[in-house]
A protein has these predicted regions:
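Short acidic-glycine-tyrosine-enriched beta hairpin
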Residues: 15-17, 80-98
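Ligand-binding loop in jelly-roll beta-barrel domains
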Residues: 38, 75, 95-121
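Conserved hydrophobic/aromatic beta-strand scaffold that supports enzyme active sites
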Residues: 31, 44-48, 66, 82, ...
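A short, N-terminal "cap"/entry segment at the start of jelly-roll beta-barrel domains
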Residues: 1-41, 129-154
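Conserved short histidine dyad/triad with adjacent acidic residue
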Residues: 17, 28-32, 45-60
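A hydrophobic, small-residue-rich beta->alpha segment in the mid-to-C-terminal subdomain
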Residues: 110, 124-130
Length: 154
């Protein structure tokens, strides 16, 4: 209901205070705005990579990614090039483009990522639940990845 008592189907504003998102420590991700909160429009999360941390070559079948470097730098490896983006820079990675990302520095780096459409948070949550249950191994990791449209190429 809005202030006049009339039911409204319009999206409502969301305000997220600092440090209030759900943190998934083992993968260095903090949910800021989830699939449920945005009605599936997008997912926003913060990620912290330690020195040299990152992931292997992969692609997303479902979502585009936009990354903003808050602190440090982000090294993005594509099929034929590697690009380093520094604090204040933005990177747009369309779906179906193979890429790997890592922190090239000797200090932690912080990033803000948005995926469009939403849904990647559900993959992170599934990984977190399996880890907490003690069932997360490489086979389950790869299965859950495929379930959420992520293909590991290395």
């Amino acid at each position: 209901m809005n202030e006049t008592g009339v039911k409204s189907d319009l999206p409502q504003p969301i305000f997220v205070p600092p440090h209030s998102g759900k943190a998934l420590e083992f993968i260095g991700v903090t949910h800021i705005l989830t699939t449920n909160q945005t009605g599936g429009a997008y997912y926003l999360f913060e990620s912290v990579f330690g020195p040299g941390d990152g992931n292997q070559l992969h692609l997303h079948r479902r979502e585009d990614e936009v990354g903003y470097v808050l602190e440090g730098a982000l090294e993005i490896r594509l099929a034929d090039q590697t690009v380093v983006v520094e604090a204040g820079s933005v990177a747009h990675l369309p779906k179906n483009i193979p890429h790997a990302i890592r922190n090239p520095l000797q200090t932690p780096s912080r990033y803000l990522f948005m995926t469009i459409p939403a849904g990647l948070d559900q993959w992170f949550d599934a990984l977190d639940a399996a880890r907490n249950a003690g069932t997360l191994d490489d086979a389950l990791y790869r299965k859950l990845s495929l379930d959420y449209g992520i293909e590991w190429l290395e």
